[in-house]
Amino acid sequence: PDFHTATMPLGDDPDGETDIYATVVRYSPTDAHRLHNRPAMLFVHGMSDYFFHRHVAEFFYQCGWAVYAIDLRKCGRSWRPGQRWHHTTDVAQYFEELTSALAYLSEMHNTVVIQGHSTGGLVVALWLDHLRNSAPELHAHIAGAVLNSPWLDMMVPKPVSETLKPVLRWAGARWPNVSMPAGNLTAYGKSVSAEHYGEWVIDPEMKPL
């Protein structure tokens, strides 16, 4: 009852799947009518993720923030039948819903801080750079950005990364929907999930471990 959602229709999917949507989540306790007097914080999740962090929303609300989050297209609450979970061929596609969400927040809040986690940190950094050139009047509402464990580089030594970049660009342009082998990446998910070793209740369909 303390969380409300608003769905943003985004129209046709540039990757050819069903119509896409994004979802803005707002933490709205009983005194939420006073939210417009607060600065806003917008959380942007990472890859294969969604917003479920009640304790984070409660903490920042108690610190004086109006707390929002966005589930990006095909992620979490924004997924629709006929779509591959979390699939995009270009992270710049996320700029559309982030700009729309910021426009919505700027109608109620003079100040907005963006918090991006993991791949969300990469997306936020790229989006804000794009926004300052494409919509400076909206960018003016941004007071800062917090990048939480941002994925800004590959998890391999620099010489390996530089060698692989042209190969991956070539392969990605020709086979954009082919998945790369990733090995076992379950350690982090299990470490935070209450069903394994952590404390958080996570929907395994929205956030596969």
Question: PLM features: residue spans?
Answer:
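Conserved alpha/beta-hydrolase
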Residues: 49-57, 61-82
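The Walker A (P-loop) glycine that initiates the GxxxxGKT/S ATP-binding motif of P-loop NTPases
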Residues: 116
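Alpha/beta-hydrolase-fold enzymes
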Residues: 119, 123-209
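N-terminal cap/lid segment of alpha/beta-hydrolase-fold proteins
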Residues: 1-35
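Catalytic nucleophile-loop/oxyanion-hole region of alpha/beta-hydrolase
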Residues: 47-48, 76-111
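Short beta-strand element of the alpha/beta-hydrolase
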Residues: 37-46
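Short coil/turn segments at beta-strand junctions that form active-site/ligand-binding loops
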Residues: 38-39, 65, 109-111
